[in-house]
């Protein structure tokens, strides 16, 4: 894809799943990739796959809730590759201790709300604040945030998570609206149920069947499905696409 070969992208949450898939896809297109994650062993595994196939990538340990570690991620990327051309925000707190206690407005404890918003929403604010000045300085750049199909209100549970993702949709539009004229593109992908590491660990057959029944396709999502659209949005092939939220979920949002 145009505008990827030789350019550098930060994957903020690239140890597994969609982030790892996007890192590998970008590298296969000739891009330099900085894979950041709190799970440094997972990030290193992603990088080993990339470099083993001749790609260029580094792994950096960072935490979406820690502004200093985000600065370290940016600094490490610049030290290794000399520039930053795009950012893919994909990390979130999907731990059983947090997401597993995220249910309804009456049942979800405030500590779950605080943790969810601090990581899922403010984490993206922090990474954008760290990267955006670099993109503005060079007059171009693309940001792709990871929202969720749940932000559309189709999930009766996980209220804090879905609210954080709905706010990400607004954050995405804000960046496009305020900085688009300065060469910055900001879009979001809203995945349906993607069978990555978290879903495989939770193994919620009832949820899987619910999404599959609502889908207008014959399978659930794979990380590669999201990696393809994210890579496109980061590339110059999508240079006239800005401020959009893309639902990628087999049309499972189209309820009967």
Predicted regions and their residues:
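Canonical Rossmann dinucleotide-binding motif of NAD(H)/NADP(H)-dependent dehydrogenases/reductases
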Residues: 2-34
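Short, small/polar-rich loop/turn modules that mediate ligand/substrate recognition or access, typified
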Residues: 82, 180, 185, 190, ...
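Catalytic Tyr-X3-Lys loop
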Residues: 85, 106-125, 140, 144, ...
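Substrate-binding pocket helix/loop in short-chain dehydrogenase/reductase
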Residues: 97-114, 199, 211
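Active-site helix of classical SDR
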Residues: 128, 164, 172
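Alpha-helical segment proximal to the catalytic Tyr-Lys
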Residues: 133, 177-178, 239
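Residue(s) in the substrate-gating loop at a strand-loop-helix junction
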Residues: 148
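Short C-terminal tail/terminal secondary-structure segment
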Residues: 153, 213, 231, 242-256
């Amino acid at each position: 894809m145009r505008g990827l070969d030789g350019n550098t992208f930060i994957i903020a949450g690239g140890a597994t799943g969609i982030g790892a898939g996007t890192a590998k896809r970008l590298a296969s297109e000739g891009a330099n990739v900085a894979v950041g994650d709190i799970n440094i062993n997972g990030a290193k595994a992603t990088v080993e796959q990339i470099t083993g196939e001749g790609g260029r990538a580094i792994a950096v340990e960072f935490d979406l809730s820690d502004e200093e570690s985000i600065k370290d991620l940016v600094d490490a990327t610049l030290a290794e590759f000399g520039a930053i051309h795009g950012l893919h925000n994909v990390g979130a707190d999907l731990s059983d201790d947090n997401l597993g206690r995220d249910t309804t407005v009456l049942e979800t404890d405030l500590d779950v709300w605080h943790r969810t918003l601090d990581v899922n929403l403010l984490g993206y604010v922090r990474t954008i604040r760290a990267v955006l000045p670099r993109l503005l300085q060079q007059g171009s750049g693309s940001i792709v945030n990871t929202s969720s199909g749940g932000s559309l209100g189709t999930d009766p549970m996980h209220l804090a998570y879905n609210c954080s993702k709905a706010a990400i949709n607004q954050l995405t539009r804000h960046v496009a609206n305020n900085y688009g004229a300065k060469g910055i593109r900001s879009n979001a992908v809203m995945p349906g149920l993607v069978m990555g590491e978290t879903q495989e660990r939770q193994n919620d057959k009832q949820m899987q069947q619910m999404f599959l029944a609502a889908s207008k396709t014959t399978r659930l999502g794979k990380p590669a499905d999201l990696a393809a659209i994210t890579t496109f949005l980061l590339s110059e092939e999508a240079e006239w696409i800005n401020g959009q939220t893309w639902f990628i979920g087999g049309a499972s949002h189209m309820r009967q």
